Amino acid sequence: MNTMSKTVRELLKEKLDQLQCHFTWGPQKETIDLDDMMYRLQDSIDLNLKYKARSCNQFAFVNSLQGNYEEAIQNLKEAEKILRENYKDAFERRSIITYGNYAWVHYHMGQLTEAQSYLDKLEMICKPLTDGPRYTAMIPEVYGEKGWSLLRSAAQYYEEAMECFEKALEEDPNNTEWIMGFATALYRLEAIPGTPEKCKSSQSVNHLRRVLELDPEESLAMVMLALKLQENKQKKEANELVQQALQKSPDVPKVLRNAAKFYRLEQAGEKAIELLKKALGRTPHNSVLHDQIGMCYRVQLLEVFKNPLSSDPQNPEFQQKMVLIDHCKHHFGKAFEHRPRTAIKSQLDYADICLRNGENSKAGEVYSKLLELEGISPENMQRIWLQAGLFQLHKRKSDSNAVQLFQKGLKIENNSKVWKMCYENLDKWAEKKLCRDSHDSKALGVKGLLHQIDGDKSKAIEYFEEALEFDPSNEEYLSALCELRLSFEEHHDL
């Protein structure tokens, strides 16, 4: 490539970086599960849902990330066609993101003239809409599409998605598309431990009600609202909403899935499985549906385990147990088949079923693979360390490995249920050890760590000093003791 063409390319890249489209938003190859997203987007396109153009646009981006540029162009042509049909008068406003994506794909293909032609189109569209950048306009349609794209990508983008919908609603306050987006972002954030939204976990209710005021046919809003009302013990209205949603949208997978969750939480497992299998018939690769079915069968399996007859191979209860084990393993296995980096809970549930069936080596393989994964969220790593630690403690009888894993779990200070379980397991293990041998340096060190976490510095110092009596060259204890003494002295000097 000569200097001149390189300069043209670089200048073009500077313009492309100013665009508002999938290529300039946060989610990139490293932060999204591409295989899983491709399946979800394909399902959405195949179902021919209301906002199919949105899925085509995001599919173009995912295809481009994988170097499938010709497929990406086809996705964008499909998106453009749908937008022209659905938004005749508002097509130009709706096309800003699609044209931005076109420009980026042509750039990656080395087709710089074509890329520039889309920048020219964007300049003509955006000029009357904004006094800002030449090639984009921060209008509700752009904020809204960005919000939905972020929501589809990963939990780490939910806060930003909510902010995008907020911006869209500032100019277009009665748009159900953006209110639904805002409600969905809130709804998801309310389910995540430690988020400010979790502390005020009914905010989404008002926004979902607003969606239904403006669009009484929005069945997904109905089932989402029903789940929030169920959480708040408003069972009668919740039940009516679910039935209404199923009448209006008897074949929409997202509606069926959320309705199934409602019935599962009401202990109506068979009804939940029936709805989930119906949804699976329409979207056979949907990993979330497989996970939900696995959870329903798991509830049934745990009930069967309570019956002593289930351990007698001659008894029908035993046969039922084996059938349920197969169902659980099949569906949990399908749930993480294409998304090993994101379907962590499904893999942990699969390992749990293996352990209950005496398949310890198979469970061990699952834990080993999980411990090797990279780029996992801290919350998911914490779950892995807890479950792998329990496996090491109870099945492998390896105290040192178990303690190491529980300690890793404590380093993620989120005060979650999983964090508390790591703490409790360490405390229980240390107490048990010290009852047998009061000179056990490892157990004394663990007690020191737990007191340090609790903020009881004098007790922590006492335990670390005692641990060092029996393991005088332990660098971990020496370092902790040094840090504690300094902190203790500073506090008392004040």
What do these predicted ranges mean?
Residues 41-48, 82-93, 125-139, 178, ...:
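Flexible helix-coil transition and linker loops at the boundaries of alpha-helical arrays
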Residues 55, 98, 132, 178, ...:
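TPR alpha-solenoid repeat register
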Residues 87-88, 110, 152-155, 183, ...:
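Short coil/turn linking the two alpha-helices of tandem helical-hairpin repeats
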Residues 17, 51, 58, 65, ...:
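"A position-specific structural signal for the A-helix of alpha-solenoid helical repeats
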Residues 62, 105, 149-151, 185, ...:
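Residue-level signature for tetratricopeptide repeat
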Residues 24-40, 66-83, 111-127, 154-162, ...:
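Helix-turn-helix repeat elements of alpha-solenoid scaffolds
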Residues 39-42, 77, 84, 120, ...:
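Alpha-solenoid helical repeat scaffolds
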Residues 52, 86, 95, 174-175, ...:
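Residue-level recognition of tetratricopeptide repeat
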